[in-house]
Structures are given as C-alpha cells and as structure tokens.
Amino acid sequence: MAAGKEIRGKIKSVENTKKITKAMEMVAASKMRKAQERMRAARPYSDKIRNVAANLSQANPEYTHAFMESNDAKATGFIVVTTDKGLCGGLNTNVLRAVTSKLKDLQAAGHDALAVAIGNKGLGFLNRVGAKVVSHATQLGDKPHLEKLIGPVKVLLDAYSEGKINAVYLCYTKFINTMRQEPVVEQLLPLTAAHLQADKDQHGWDYIYEPDAQTVIDDLLLRYVEALIYQAVAENMASEQSARMVAMKAATDNAGSVIGELKLIYNKTRQAAITKELSEIVAGAAAV
C-alpha cells in the first residue's frame, strides 16, 4: 500500500492548502468591504473640490493655472498604481500591460518617460523594463494615507509646473464591481474642461475669497489633483481585495476538486490492492 500512503499524503497536503486559501478568501472579503467603504467615502471630497474649483475658474477666466497649461516638452510622466502583494489574479498584469503599450507609443514618438511607482509590483516591473523611476511609494498597508503619497507624486507635479514634462498619466485598476475591475490609463495633467466641470445642480456663486480667488484656485487645484490620485489608490485597493477574494475562492474550489479526484484514485488503488490479496489467497487455497 505504498501508493495508497503516498496518495493519502497528497490529500493531506491539498487539504492544508485548501484551509489556507479559504482563510485568505475570508480575510480578503473582509478587507474588500472596508476598502470599498474608503473608496466611496473619498468621492464626495474630490467632487466638492471639483465643484468649487470649477466655479472659481469660470468666474476668473483670465487666470490659467500651470496645471491647465499645455507645453511641448519631450517627456511624459506616469503614476503607476499597483499592489504590494501578489495572489490577486491578473490585476497587476493587466494594468502593467496597458502601461507597456503607452510607453511603446511614447518611445515611437521620441518621448522620454518619467515614472512614479506606487506599489512593489509596479516598482519591480518599471525597474525591469528600464523605465526612469523618479520616486516611489510602497508598503502603504490596508489604509492608504495621503501624506505617504504626496512626497513621491510631488516630483512629477513640480516637473509639470516647470514645463519639464508635457503630461502626467494616472495608471491604476478601476473598481467596477466585485467580479469586474478594469485597467485604466487616464490623463491627469493638463487638467481639461472635463476635469473642471461643475455639477448641473450647482447654483451661482457670489462668495468673497481671502486672500484672493487666484490663491484659492492654486491651492484647490493642487488638492484636487491629490484627491484624484488618492481616489485611484483607493480604487486600486478595492480592486486588489476583490480580485484576491475571487482568486482564493477559485483556488479553494480547485483544491476541493483535486481532493475529490485523489480520494477516488485512493479508493480505486485500495480496492485493487484488496482484490489482489483476495486473488492470491484464493489461488493459494486452490494450490493446496
């Protein structure tokens, strides 16, 4: 029964793996709910800033912030948001494939690329492909804080304000629902009219701003861009936990199938061994 013993060992091993994947599935489900709550809680903040900035910009059309001006620089910035850990299906692969496609288009046009990596997976990828990583933020944990993002991202924002890069793209995985997440590569800078469009139900504004509207616009647009980046990180984290939960559920289900197949093989092997022993006993009795 050496074969039977080996099969029992495999069954035990797969059962242990199944327990691990089931536990990871439950942990991911809990984290997913919390990540979705953070993602939804961040939206009203960015929406309110956008409305205020939009109304201010419309009231002061003669003033154009640096984030709204285009330039002819031969370099482009990328903020690449990925996960710190794996075991989340093709989440990182899909967004990095989209980044690779965009990088190839820029290289074909003769443009350089400067990147900020948020997450270990993106940092490792950008280093492997030889991209110029100007800063990075990793180990953000389950609760991302804007303070950890501002420093690394500010490098690209300052470069755009100084005319060193012609655009900044935000690359992340957008959360659609628990079963669906989409890789996104969207233009962050320069800000367009679509970015600064007030809600239709907003009433006319007649406020006095101190020290002046221009200073308020400068501060609000920076906060708005930071809020968009934070929202992308929050969406990516919700997508990560959803993808991990689905991946671990699939692994748990597959482990169950493997266990069933191994038990069937074990039973057949055991039955064959018993049949063989009985045949030998009968043959021995017949010989006597």
Swiss-Prot record:
Which Pfam families does the annotation name?
A: ATP-synt
GO cellular-component term (any): proton-transporting ATP synthase complex
Report the protein name in the record.
Answer: ATP synthase gamma chain
SUPFAM superfamilies named among the record's database cross-references: ATP synthase (F1-ATPase), gamma subunit (SSF52943)
| Stored PROSITE patterns | ATPASE_GAMMA
Q: Which family does it belong to?
A: Belongs to the ATPase gamma chain family.
Classification via InterPro entries? ATP_synth_F1_ATPase_gsu (IPR035968), ATP_synth_F1_gsu (IPR000131), ATP_synth_F1_gsu_CS (IPR023632)
Organism classification: Bacteria, Pseudomonadati, Pseudomonadota, Betaproteobacteria, Burkholderiales
Query: Which BP terms from GO are recorded?
Result: proton motive force-driven plasma membrane ATP synthesis
Question: Where does it reside?
Answer: Cell inner membrane
Gene Ontology molecular function: any one: proton-transporting ATP synthase activity, rotational mechanism
Ordered alphabetically, the record's keywords are: ATP synthesis, Cell inner membrane, Cell membrane, CF(1), Hydrogen ion transport, Ion transport, Membrane, Transport
Protein's UniProt keywords contain S-adenosyl-L-methionine: no
